[in-house]
């Protein structure tokens, strides 16, 4: 179940609150609260600060995530985002488990409901000794949208 409330402030600012409740057989009950702040920089560019907290049944505490993205529409059917984020947990203490930077290229192709994304990223997770090592990843996503 999902609830979303969006509040624009003038032409350039927007605040969005999203609450998501899930029940899955393995993870059981999960609740995520998200708060986004957006500022339109130009007609085709905006900056977004996203914040999440998630509680999952059977875990001690919450996981959290905060990040900033710069999103730009390149053409009518393509866009790119530059992202940075960090996330962690609040138990036994508030800690940062991982840092991330990435770029996502998104393009609509062939049909209005078909998209692909290419996303390289670098993360710096904390290992058991507390050290951070670079981890590189590349994701390719195919998205099919149903409905309007």
Model-based region annotation:
Residues 15-19, 33, 45-51, 66, ...:
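Membrane-embedded beta-strand positions of outer-membrane beta-barrel proteins
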Residues 3-7, 21, 33-39, 66-72, ...:
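Residues on the lipid-exposed face of transmembrane beta-strands in outer-membrane beta-barrel proteins
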Residues 20-64, 68-70:
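Aromatic-anchored, glycine/proline-accented short structural segments
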Residues 109, 133-148:
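Outer-membrane beta-barrel "beta-signal"
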Residues 4-10, 18-28, 52-60, 77, ...:
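Sequence/structural signature of outer-membrane beta-barrel proteins
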Residues 6-12, 38-44, 71-79, 110-112, ...:
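Outer-membrane beta-barrel channels and translocator barrels
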């Amino acid at each position: 179940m999902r609830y979303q409330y969006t509040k624009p402030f003038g032409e350039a600012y927007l605040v969005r609150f999203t609450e998501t409740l899930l029940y899955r057989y393995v993870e059981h009950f999960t609740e995520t609260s998200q708060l986004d702040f957006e500022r339109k920089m130009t007609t085709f560019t905006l900056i977004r600060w996203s914040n999440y907290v998630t509680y999952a049944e059977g875990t001690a505490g919450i996981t959290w995530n905060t990040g900033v993205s710069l999103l730009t529409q390149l053409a009518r059917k393509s866009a790119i985002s530059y992202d940075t984020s960090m996330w962690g947990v609040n138990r036994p203490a508030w800690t940062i488990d991982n840092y991330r930077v990435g770029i996502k290229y998104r393009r609509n192709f062939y049909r209005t409901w078909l998209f692909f994304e290419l996303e390289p990223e670098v993360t710096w997770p904390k290992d058991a000794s507390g050290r951070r090592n670079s981890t590189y990843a590349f994701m390719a996503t195919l998205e099919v949208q149903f409905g309007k």
